[in-house]
Amino acid sequence: IQVADQVFVDDSSLDIDHMMETMYATAEASKSACPSPDDYLRAFEGAKNIFLVTITGTLSGSHNSAQLAKNIYLEDHPDTKIHVIDSLSAGGEVDLLVEKLNDLIDQGLSFEEVVEAITTYQEKTKLLFVLAKVDNLVKNGRLSKLIGTVVGLLNIRMVGEASKTGTLELLQKARGPKKSVQAAYDEIIKAGYAGGRIVMAQRNNEKCCQQLSDR
């Protein structure tokens, strides 16, 4: 992720607070680049069974890069098994898929059984999101400055979902954190949630997550 003249790598050492502060402090649009095939190849090294979950291919080239790396790796390591999953999503749903993969592997299932089970599971998962700021959408030209200003002044939160094809779609606009929590809860019920694991990913918004969790 490039913000002005600084480059941030999204790994375990990333200082997210510093990155966000830098992002909000500059008027320039931020830019991002997906992992290269070489990045994936280094991660594959030494493994016999590999499961890889990428952010939705509609937002990033990560999935295509991973598929290319898979094909390259299998040329030299034909006995390795690799399954690349396009999450068709982002954020918490990616975490949900990774957690489920770990559960399936811990059950001692074969590689093929894990592939079948995670494919079935993914059909039942869903991403809902609440966006409190639209600064980067304005900077990147995806939203007009006028709309961005109105959203900020009226404290409007965007409530949306990842579609079945992996695009991010707007569902509702809610004014203020309380109404956005209610809107998110309504969308969860509308989506047919009837129990099961929920992953909530947030940045500096623990209060809203707790309010939703308490519903």
Model-found features: residue ranges?
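N-terminal glycine-rich anion-binding loop in soluble enzyme alpha/beta folds
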Residues: 1-39
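Conserved beta-strand scaffold positions in the cores of enzyme catalytic domains, especially
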Residues: 52, 82-84
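Mixed-charge interfacial surface used for oligomerization/domain docking
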Residues: 1-6, 59-62, 66-71, 83, ...
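Structured helix-beta-strand junction loops
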Residues: 25-26, 46-47, 124, 194
